[in-house]
Every structure is written in structure tokens, then in C-alpha cells.
């Protein structure tokens, strides 16, 4: 166990410092969205409060940068360093604490798992750049950590801070608040493996009934979370939309395919912990095959085919920018008509995988909350972004069975290989646009 922890920490520290120094050496100037974020932060540091309408997220990251500027300055490297410290030090510590609280255990396996989740490739990559996602993720997880520690006030304050990084975090605040109240009540909440659809509905009704009977008891937590929710409503009334700045390219829509893309994302980055063990079990393989070839599956595939046909959205941002990996997924793969319609059959298998592993330890209420929050986070977004999947991925992993130490090490190795490759591609596989002959373009998540 000591050797495993040593390998994880040495590799983590080595790649963290290598990435920081290499990106600052080869990419010293702001790149892609950093052009807007760094310029805005540096304006704030000069006490110039003019807002760039191209920026559609709140100014939380810039305000933190202004607060820290007397100590670290406001240069490009100083601003990037803020995210690096949070991503490399803050997130592993915070995830370790959350996993310990949820599983009521400490030790090497929890540490392995914390670094495994922190090494999730898109999350790890953006720790080196000045983007809002690292701060957003940190404050949402901090709010959840406080809720698990029964501190509703601290949790609600963290939720408030998270809204200054990304507006859609209001959905996660609702999840966190309900989780807090549920952990302090006794109500009908059967294990998912033993629950029917009617039981899930009864769980929701039972929770609401007990909650309403305990309003006086929960008055302080209700006021804490309620104040944050009211501040969000006030922002909506003032701004007229959830989006700041230019709203034309960020209109809400119904994008059901997002859930399918998330499933692929989830299993691609976690297959050493779940799919390998799943496939090695004869009983689970048999159960999966019988489910896939059932009459119910025919109906599910039919719905998935309709979603693929009518709800595969080719967002202009993705098709116009060949610097992102998703450009090649949509512009090359999804343009192949038969491949688009082959996808629903893979989604069906992933749906059954997902449901089966969720039944291993999840309660009905937790499953309902996670499903609802994931849908509300992803489905309204017409733009597909790997960064949108980060919080759903982490919260689902928190509530699934803790992998073994060996499985964590395999998943960590997968992540770090991908991180090394994507860092190399970002730094050295550059190309030039004819329209900008003096600027190097780079591939990234």
C-alpha cells in the first residue's frame, strides 16, 4: 500500500510541476478563452470594472484574482497559478474528505480514489489554464463537504460563492440542500436494488411529508439555502437571463443527446473501476445480455434512435473550431450517418451498466436526485463541452461503490497516460490557420 501511495504522489507532483512549467514556457500568452478571462481579470486588477460582453459567466474568478493580487500579482502566470494551486492541492484534499465522510472510512484506498478523481483528464488539464471550471468545481464540492459535516450555513455560503463562477451551479445547490435535509431526517428511502418505480415516487412523497413537518426544526438551514436561492432569482430578474454578456449563442434548448454523451464520457474514464470487474462476473454478464434482448429494450432503442435522428445538435461553436477534440467527433464521426444510428445501441448497454452499478449501494432518493440534477445540468445546454460533465461525473462517482486499491491504480494510470498525451499534443502538435499566420493553434479538450 505504501508503494502505491508513493507512486501516485510522485507521479502527481512530477506531472503537476512539469505541466505548469512547460505550459508557461511554451504558451506564455493567453490561449483561446484565456484571452477573454485574463484580459478581464487584469482590467479588474487595474480597478477598471468595464465588462467584456463576450464573457457569459460571472466574475467570481476575477474577483478572487483581485483579492490575491497584492500577494501574487496579476500577471499571466500569477493568474494561472491560482487554478493550479486549487486543482493540484485543493481538489485532492477536498475529494479525499468527501469520500471519507460518505464511506465512513479513511486510509490508502480513499487517498488513491481522491487522486484518481482529481486526475480526471479534462479536470486536470484545465488546472493549468485560467478558466472558471476549477474554481466552480471547488466551491460546489466545498459546499457538499460542509453539508456532509452538518454545517448548513458554511455550505450555503460556499454555494453562494460557486454561483459567482457558474450560474448553473444553482442546480447542484438544490441537490446539496436536499441531501443535507435528508441526512437529518428519517423517512421511507429503500435501497435502489430493492425499489420499484412506485417506491421511488413514494420516497419523494415521504421526504416532502417529513420535511414539511420539520420546517421549524430546519428554519436556520432553510433560511441559509433559501437566501442563496433568492439571490439567484434576483440575478435572473436583474439580468433577464441566466447568461451574462452575449446571450445569442447560449440559448437554452432541449438536448437529450447530452445524457448519452455523458454516459460515454463516464465509462471511458472509469472503465478500469467498473466495466472490467463487471465483465468478469458471469452472473452480471448474463443479466446484462438478458436485459439488452428484452422487449423493454426494443422500446428504449426506438426512443434513442429518435433522439439520435432529431436531437443530435451540431452547435456552430463546435463546427467552427478545430482546436477542440469534440470538433473531430462531430465533424468526422457524427457526419457518418450509419455511425450516428449505431450509437443508440451502445447507449442502451451503457444505460443498463449504469443502472446496475447504481443499485449496488445507492438509495432511491440519491438516485432520483442525481438523475434529476444531471438532466437539469446537461439537457438545457445546446453546446457539448467536456467541462460540463465534470461535476456530474464526480457526484456519481462519490455515490457508487468505492473501487479497490488495484482498480484505483489502474484508473489513475489510465488518466495519467491520457494527461501526458494530451499535454504533449497541446504543447508540441501545433498548427497554423491561414487567417492567422503568426499564431500557433493548439489541440485541447
Curated annotation (Swiss-Prot):
Listed GO MF terms: dolichyl pyrophosphate Glc2Man9GlcNAc2 alpha-1,2-glucosyltransferase activity
GO cellular component entries: endoplasmic reticulum; lumenal side of endoplasmic reticulum membrane
Cross-referenced Pfam families: DIE2_ALG10
Residues passing through the membrane, by range: 7-27, 54-74, 81-101, 123-143, 170-190, 192-212, 218-238, 256-276, 298-318, 336-356, 364-384, 408-428
Glycosylation sites: 76, 239
Compartment(s) where it occurs, according to its Swiss-Prot or TrEMBL record: Endoplasmic reticulum membrane
Metabolic or biological pathway, per its Swiss-Prot or TrEMBL entry: Protein modification; protein glycosylation
UniProt GO BP: dolichol-linked oligosaccharide biosynthetic process; protein N-linked glycosylation
Biological role stated in the UniProt entry: Dol-P-Glc:Glc(2)Man(9)GlcNAc(2)-PP-Dol alpha-1,2-glucosyltransferase that operates in the biosynthetic pathway of dolichol-linked oligosaccharides, the glycan precursors employed in protein asparagine (N)-glycosylation. The assembly of dolichol-linked oligosaccharides begins on the cytosolic side of the endoplasmic reticulum membrane and finishes in its lumen. The sequential addition of sugars to dolichol pyrophosphate produces dolichol-linked oligosaccharides containing fourteen sugars, including two GlcNAcs, nine mannoses and three glucoses.
Name the record gives this protein: Dol-P-Glc:Glc(2)Man(9)GlcNAc(2)-PP-Dol alpha-1,2-glucosyltransferase
Amino acid at each position: 500500500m505504501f508503494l502505491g501511495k508513493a507512486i501516485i504522489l510522485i507521479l502527481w507532483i512530477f506531472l503537476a510541476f512539469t505541466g505548469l512549467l512547460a505550459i508557461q514556457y511554451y504558451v506564455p500568452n493567453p490561449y483561446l478563452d484565456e484571452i477573454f478571462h485574463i484580459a478581464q481579470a487584469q482590467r479588474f486588477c487595474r480597478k477598471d470594472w468595464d465588462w467584456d460582453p463576450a464573457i457569459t459567466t460571472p466574475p467570481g474568478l476575477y474577483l478572487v484574482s483581485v483579492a490575491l493580487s497584492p500577494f501574487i500579482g496579476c500577471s499571466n502566470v500569477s493568474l494561472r497559478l491560482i487554478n493550479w494551486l486549487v486543482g493540484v492541492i485543493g481538489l485532492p484534499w477536498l475529494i479525499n474528505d468527501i469520500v471519507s465522510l460518505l464511506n465512513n472510512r479513511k486510509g490508502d484506498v480513499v487517498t488513491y480514489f481522491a487522486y484518481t478523481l482529481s486526475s480526471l483528464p479534462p479536470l486536470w488539464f484545465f488546472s493549468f489554464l485560467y478558466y472558471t471550471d476549477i474554481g466552480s468545481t471547488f466551491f460546489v464540492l466545498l459546499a457538499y463537504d460542509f453539508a456532509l459535516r452538518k454545517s448548513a450555513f458554511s455550505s450555503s455560503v460556499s454555494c453562494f460563492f460557486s454561483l459567482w463562477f457558474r450560474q448553473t451551479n444553482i442546480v447542484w445547490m438544490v441537490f446539496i440542500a436536499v441531501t443535507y435535509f435528508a441526512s437529518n431526517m428519517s423517512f421511507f428511502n429503500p435501497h435502489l436494488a430493492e425499489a420499484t418505480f412506485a417506491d421511488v415516487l413514494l420516497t419523494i412523497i415521504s421526504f416532502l411529508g417529513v420535511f414539511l413537518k420539520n420546517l421549524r426544526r430546519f428554519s436556520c438551514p432553510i433560511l441559509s439555502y433559501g437566501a442563496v436561492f433568492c439571490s439567484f432569482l434576483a440575478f435572473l430578474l436583474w439580468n433577464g437571463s441566466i447568461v451574462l454578456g452575449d446571450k445569442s449563442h447560449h440559448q437554452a434548448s432541449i438536448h437529450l443527446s447530452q445524457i448519452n454523451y455523458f454516459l460515454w464520457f463516464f465509462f471511458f474514464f472509469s472503465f478500469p473501476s467498473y466495466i472490467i470487474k463487471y465483465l468478469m462476473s458471469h452472473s452480471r454478464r448474463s443479466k446484462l445480455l438478458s436485459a439488452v434482448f428484452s422487449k423493454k429494450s426494443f422500446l428504449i432503442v426506438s426512443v434513442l434512435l429518435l433522439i439520435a435522428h432529431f436531437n443530435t445538435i451540431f452547435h456552430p461553436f463546435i463546427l467552427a473550431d478545430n482546436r477542440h477534440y469534440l470538433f473531430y467527433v462531430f465533424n468526422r464521426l457524427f457526419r457518418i450517418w450509419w455511425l450516428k444510428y449505431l450509437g443508440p445501441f451502445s447507449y442502451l448497454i451503457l444505460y443498463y451498466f449504469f443502472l446496475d452499478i447504481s443499485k449496488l449501494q445507492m438509495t432511491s432518493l440519491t438516485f432520483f436526485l442525481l438523475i434529476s440534477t444531471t438532466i437539469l445540468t446537461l439537457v438545457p445546454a445546446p453546446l457539448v463541452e467536456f467541462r460540463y460533465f465534470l461535476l456530474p461525473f464526480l457526484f456519481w462517482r462519490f455515490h457508487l461503490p468505492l473501487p479497490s486499491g488495484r482498480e484505483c491504480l489502474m484508473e489513475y494510470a489510465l488518466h495519467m497516460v491520457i494527461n501526458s498525451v494530451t499535454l504533449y499534443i497541446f504543447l508540441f502538435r501545433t498548427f497554423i490557420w491561414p487567417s492567422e499566420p503568426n499564431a500557433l493553434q493548439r489541440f485541447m479538450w
